[in-house]
A protein has these predicted regions:
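Broad hydrophobic/π-residue packing in well-ordered secondary structure
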Residues: 42, 82-83, 129, 149
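Hydrophobic alpha-helical transmembrane segments and immediately flanking/interface helices
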Residues: 119-143
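Membrane-interfacial helix-loop-helix
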Residues: 1-23, 45-113, 133-137, 143, ...
């Protein structure tokens, strides 16, 4: 995360506020809120600002993934150049879906809420879409999971559990 912060300070800091940068980092797949909170801490933002902007950034992509990813994948799957990537993404997401498929709501909460590599809102929304979990149920589970991940990452980055 240090390299992301250094890159930001050497260029985009002139045009993008720290808060917006944290929000943008939190929107990225794989990095998400987990990275956004760490970046906020490195940029010396308050815990309140870190939470607000990383939560907003992590939540923004979720409805789009839940509502449109299956259609986008259906459209891209037959293409020569992107079909393989789509199949690879689907296979990777489904390989992590066992706990979610067994206990839909709580499985999704746990999957999104435990900040481990390859988990989070993006992958959780992708799995929920591929398993055809009801959008309202998936949204609630993912939001709860994101809140849990935010709590854990805040404790690690700002407080009790320093790593």
């Amino acid at each position: 995360m240090d390299s992301i912060v250094q890159w930001y300070q050497q260029g985009p800091a002139r045009y993008i506020s720290k808060q917006v940068f944290v929000m943008l980092v939190s929107m990225l797949p794989l990095i998400e809120l987990r990275g956004g909170i760490v970046v906020a801490r490195l940029l010396k933002l308050s815990l309140g600002q870190a939470l607000i902007f990383s939560l907003i950034g992590n939540i923004i992509p979720i409805p789009f993934i839940l509502l449109f990813i299956n259609r986008i994948f259906d459209w891209l799957r037959p293409t020569k150049h992107l079909g393989g990537l789509v199949r690879k993404m689907e296979a990777r997401a489904m390989s992590k879906s066992e706990s979610v498929s067994r206990a839909e709501f709580w499985g999704l909460v746990g999957f999104v809420g435990i900040p481990l590599p390859g988990t989070g809102g993006w992958t959780g929304a992708l799995i929920a879409s591929l398993l055809k979990i009801d959008v309202k149920k998936a949204s609630a589970a993912i939001l709860l999971g994101i809140a849990i991940a935010a709590t854990i990452m805040s404790l690690i980055s700002y407080g009790v559990f320093h790593m």
